[in-house]
Amino acid sequence: MTLLIQNARCWNGGGFHTADVLLQGGKIKSLGTSISSDGVNALFDARGQYFLIPGFVDVHVHLREPGFSYKETIATGSGAAAAAGYTTVCAMPNLTPAPDTPAHLAEEQAIIDRDAKIQVLPFASITKGRKGSGELVDFEALSPKVVGFSDDGCGVQDEGLMREAMVRCKALNKVISAHCEVNDLLNGGYIHDGAYCKANGHRGISSASEWKMIERDCRLASDTGCRYHVCHISTKESVEVIREAKKSGVPVTCETGPHYLVLCDEDLQEDGRFKMNPPLRSRSDREALLEGVADGTVDVIATDHAPHSAAEKEKGLSGSAMGIVGLETAFPVLYTKLVRTGVMTFEKLIQMMAVRPREIFDLPVGEIVPGAPADLCLLDTDCNWTVDPDKFVTMGRATPFAGWQVQGKNRLTVWRGEVVYEALR
């Protein structure tokens, strides 16, 4: 397959230049001006207006297969990712069975091989059954087949267990991607323990339940040298703990989600589409996260895309399942609320969604140069549209951004040199 993208504003690592880009055999063959279209299978005109960048990478998604295909499938979840401009997603292990043995992992991989629209890289669990306690998995057997290890949805409660996991992952040069939550500090909470919670009679999740585990794990990462990535940070204390750990040379990286950067508990409504874990925190937490983005403490923006059935999300804040969908809203919401308002540069957003995730998880560098993988997306930053969950590709519909007017849309996604999504014509 040979593709030609004409008149694109191409990412060059720190900015953009206008060029034609020829793709052949799954690679970028050449860049230039007025490249001939002779022999090309498909031609796309970016009009000198659209931005061609390395495909987005989401290091935190829940694709729900095997075990929960009534919520999402690998086909629908990866299709949603393709529509949003992602060419790689990393799938969390809260599945049935959990990918805690090579045989269980093979079940998930077989579905990926059959149905994935883009690259789907699985995480294996840290503990057997992804329980956050008990017995560790066979890291050595699983390591060649996974992007990293995570018990996402559960924090590893025992310090000795986490230390051993880090020692073994360090020997394998694998990342531990940690959901940080101290069970003893949850107290049955389901939204942030803030003003809205108290005023409306809800049960709150303390900030300490998150940052205290991060503090413990940063100490363990310092001791062991393990590459330690913190999932979905949401509190100002977490930002500060990670900032200080980085200053001390701890090999720690972290992500936050779009919703934590543009919403806080002042935006809560009595609706399950506002319920996720971690919860929306306070305004001061959101401001601290934005400061962490600005100074590099926060490395990556990941969606924590977590679809549920409609029935599971229609029980208000107290009764609904935790989790929202995020793939198809991430770029437009962030571009509208942060880039358009001057909080963040467009280049910084690309770094956090397309470049830095590749660096942390040892993926091929996202470059638009001859010989690089043809994993690309084409962004229209002028398109204005209304978020309508009924038009999503994902099976999930629960988003706090329903009805928002946003600017920015993906027009084309190419993975391994093949068009996997197009909305140009």
What are the functions of these language-model segments?
Residues 1-39, 50:
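N-terminal metal-binding scaffold of metallo-dependent hydrolase/deaminase domains
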Residues 8, 26, 49, 60, ...:
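Divalent metal-coordination and catalytic microenvironments
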Residues 8, 316-319, 373-425:
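C-terminal cap of metal-dependent C-N hydrolases
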Residues 50-115:
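Metal-associated gating/positioning segment near the N- to mid-region
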Residues 59-72, 121-133, 153, 202-207:
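Active-site mouth loops of central-metabolism enzymes
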Residues 102-119, 168-178, 329:
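Alpha-helix-loop-beta-strand connector modules within alpha/beta enzyme cores
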Residues 134-301:
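Histidine/acidic residue-rich metal-binding segments in metalloenzymes
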Residues 199-227, 294-295, 299-301, 306-381:
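His/Asp/Glu-enriched, well-ordered alpha-helical/loop segment
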